[in-house]
Structures are given as structure tokens and as C-alpha cells.
């Protein structure tokens, strides 16, 4: 089932972000990874089912672009063969490795080519935008919220990745606490409604489409 996380701020360390990721280690017990970039932070907890080699670990990169996905892409081998004929090369047998090539070929229309259940976060370095999306049926969970300290958006597979729980019992955290726990004080924690996608560009904010 895996776990994905993303945060658009730069006020949280990778180590602290990984602590939030590890709260749901049962979703991704095989491996965990956190990366930093112009977009902020992105994390993945792996439950290895397909593409079991190290090359199947996410985030998947092509240049400065990257993606994490909790999902299953049915019939992905058909799309993969089409992409291979168009010159794309693949390092693993993981279904989610085709996501960036699909995005390059079709942009946001990529979802029309996906017979799948998914929750994903993708960074496009050329347009400097972060894209979060969820499958039309809503099988794979994806929550989001905004940090009180910097008003940056965060996404995660489970609510507990985004809230501090017992570690912040005060109604309004102190400035020191807020600085160390930007994800601990989320304004709202709705689940992204299916079908759903959001694009984010600094510093202009967000645009959403449902």
C-alpha cells in the first residue's frame, strides 16, 4: 500500500520530515526515502510488490523532475511498450516508473491513459510546479493541509503523517514549537475528493481542479 508525502515549505528539516513519514512505517516497511528540492520535501515509504530491485524505489527521477506514487497501474506494460518505442528507457519493472514519461507525453491528460488506482505527487522542474492527484474512484487515500507557521501545503497518505498527535497538546503552539514542527499544526485535514488534482507554483499559490 506504500506511503507518499510532500511539503512545499523550506522551514522543515529532512530529518524531521522523515519522522512524520515513519509514523506510518507499516504502509512502507521495506524502505523509506526523503528528498529535498526546489519544491520542498518529498517522501516515500515502500511496500515492495512490483519491481522488487533497488531501482524500483521511489521517488523516480528524470533529470530534476521526480514523482512518488502509492498505486497500481493496471496494464502498464502496454503503455510502457509505447513509451519505449518513443525512446524512453526504464531501469526497473515497477509500474509507477512510467508516470514521468506519461506526463512528458500527455501533460495533465496523462490520467486519461491510466487505468489505475493511485495517489501521486509529481514535480515538474521546467514549469516549477508540484502536482498532486488522486484516482477517480478514490481508492488510494491522500490528505492535505496547511502549516500554520508558513502557510505551505502538505500532502500525505494518512492523516497521522500530518498532525503531531500527543506531541503538541497546546491549542496554539509556541513559536519555538512551530518552527520545529511545521507539519504538526495543520489548519484542516480533509481527504482530497476523487477525482482530484492540484498544481502548486511558488510564489503564486495553488490552483485546484476537481
Go through each PLM region and give its residues.
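Cysteine-centered catalytic environments shared across enzyme families
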Residues: 1-210
Amino acid at each position: 500500500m506504500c506511503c507518499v508525502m510532500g511539503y512545499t515549505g523550506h522551514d522543515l528539516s529532512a530529518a524531521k520530515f522523515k519522522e512524520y513519514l515513519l509514523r506510518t512505517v507499516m504502509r512502507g516497511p521495506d524502505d523509506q526515502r526523503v528528498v529535498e528540492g526546489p519544491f520542498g520535501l518529498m517522501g516515500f515509504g515502500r511496500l515492495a510488490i512490483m519491481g522488487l530491485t533497488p531501482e524500483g524505489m521511489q521517488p523516480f527521477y528524470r533529470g530534476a523532475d521526480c514523482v512518488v506514487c502509492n498505486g497500481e497501474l493496471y496494464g502498464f506494460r502496454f503503455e510502457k511498450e509505447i513509451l519505449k518505442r518513443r525512446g524512453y528507457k526504464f531501469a526497473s519493472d515497477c509500474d509507477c516508473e512510467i508516470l514521468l514519461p506519461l506526463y512528458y507525453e500527455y501533460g495533465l491528460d496523462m490520467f486519461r491513459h491510466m487505468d489505475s488506482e493511485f495517489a501521486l505527487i509529481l514535480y515538474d522542474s521546467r514549469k516549477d510546479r508540484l502536482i498532486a492527484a488522486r484516482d477517480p474512484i478514490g481508492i488510494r487515500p491522500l490528505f492535505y493541509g496547511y502549516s500554520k507557521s508558513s502557510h505551505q501545503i502538505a500532502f500525505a497518505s494518512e492523516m497521522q503523517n500530518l498532525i503531531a498527535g500527543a506531541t503538541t497538546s497546546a491549542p496554539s503552539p509556541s513559536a519555538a514549537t512551530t518552527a520545529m514542527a511545521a507539519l504538526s499544526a495543520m489548519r484542516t485535514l480533509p481527504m482530497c475528493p476523487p477525482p482530484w488534482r492540484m498544481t502548486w507554483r511558488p510564489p503564486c499559490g495553488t490552483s485546484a481542479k476537481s
